[in-house]
């Protein structure tokens, strides 16, 4: 399956987010508000009002981290981020099997991401289940961990049995919309960076970086 798991946020950043997002005057609303017609029938969670000042402040921190992360930039080739929101799934809640919308109001959704904010031992259940062609994979990461996966996959959030699941979700529009082409570019970039770290610059490596840049120029939008 074509996905990336990665530790994105450090403890200081996590604590800052939690401090801002646990203020008493924060307004949480029914998650169905932002779901498509089909997904709304199976969505049962809470989300922070995206128009609130606290949401905009925290969203800015998240999006800045994503767009400046070297590994994420290599994997996702992010052009822009759409629809970032903070969600809570309480005891008895879940988000059933669904597919994300192809387009948000601000553009195409190529990749979906979830950032886990509370430690996984603070709640039971609540795993993110992603369905590939021949397999199903469950994810429940440590606090600050991010998973990025193609928005073309069916997925769900399993029922929370105790505690609460607290995450950030959003969507990435990539410069390269093809899953396969992004994978080729990611492998080429990773291999070139590894060679550079081990052996330093060389004429041969310059040719590899040249090929990568020109492929990205050809495939990108």
Swiss-Prot record:
Give the EC number. 1.14.11.-
Cofactor list: Fe(2+); L-ascorbate
Query: Carries keyword Iron?
Result: yes
Name the GO terms of the biological process aspect.
Answer: DNA damage response; intracellular iron ion homeostasis
Which InterPro entries did the record assign? Oxoglu/Fe-dep_dioxygenase_dom, PKHD_C, PKHD_hydroxylase, Pro_4_hyd_alph, Pro_4_hyd_alph_FE2OG_OXY
**Keywords noted in UniProt:** Dioxygenase, Iron, Metal-binding, Oxidoreductase, Vitamin C
Query: What is this enzyme's class at the first EC digit?
Result: oxidoreductase
Q: Where do the Fe2OG dioxygenase domain residues begin and end? A: 80-174
Binding-site positions, 2-oxoglutarate: 165
Q: How is the cofactor bound?
A: Binds 1 Fe(2+) ion per subunit.
Please give the positions of the paired cysteines in each disulfide bond.
none
* Sequence positions that bind Fe cation: 98, 100, 155
One GO term in the molecular function aspect is:
L-ascorbic acid binding
Pfam family for this entry, one: PKHD_C
Matching entries from NCBIfam families are given as: PRK05467.1-3
Question: What name has this protein been given in UniProt?
Answer: PKHD-type hydroxylase P9215_13741
Q: What is the lineage of its organism?
A: Bacteria, Bacillati, Cyanobacteriota, Cyanophyceae, Synechococcales
């Amino acid at each position: 399956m074509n996905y990336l798991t990665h530790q994105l946020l450090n403890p200081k950043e996590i604590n800052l987010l939690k401090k801002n997002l646990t203020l008493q005057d924060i307004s949480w609303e029914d998650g169905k508000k932002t779901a498509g017609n089909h997904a709304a029938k199976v969505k049962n969670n809470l989300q922070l009002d995206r128009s609130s000042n606290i949401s905009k402040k925290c969203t800015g921190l998240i999006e800045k981290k994503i767009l400046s992360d070297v590994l994420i930039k290599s994997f996702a080739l992010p052009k822009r981020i759409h629809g970032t929101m903070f969600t809570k799934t309480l005891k008895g809640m879940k988000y059933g099997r669904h597919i994300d919308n192809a387009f948000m109001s601000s553009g195409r959704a190529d990749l979906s991401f979830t950032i886990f904010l509370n430690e996984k031992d603070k709640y039971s259940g609540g795993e993110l289940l992603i369905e590939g062609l021949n397999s199903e994979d469950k994810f429940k990461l440590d606090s600050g961990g991010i998973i990025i996966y193609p928005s073309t996959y069916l997925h769900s959030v399993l029922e929370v049995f105790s505690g609460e699941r607290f995450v950030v979700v959003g969507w990435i529009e990539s410069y390269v919309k093809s899953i396969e082409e992004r994978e080729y570019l990611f492998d080429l970039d990773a291999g070139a960076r590894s060679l550079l770290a081990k052996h330093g610059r060389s004429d041969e490596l310059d040719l590899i970086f040249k090929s990568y840049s020109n492929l990205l120029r050809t495939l990108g939008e």
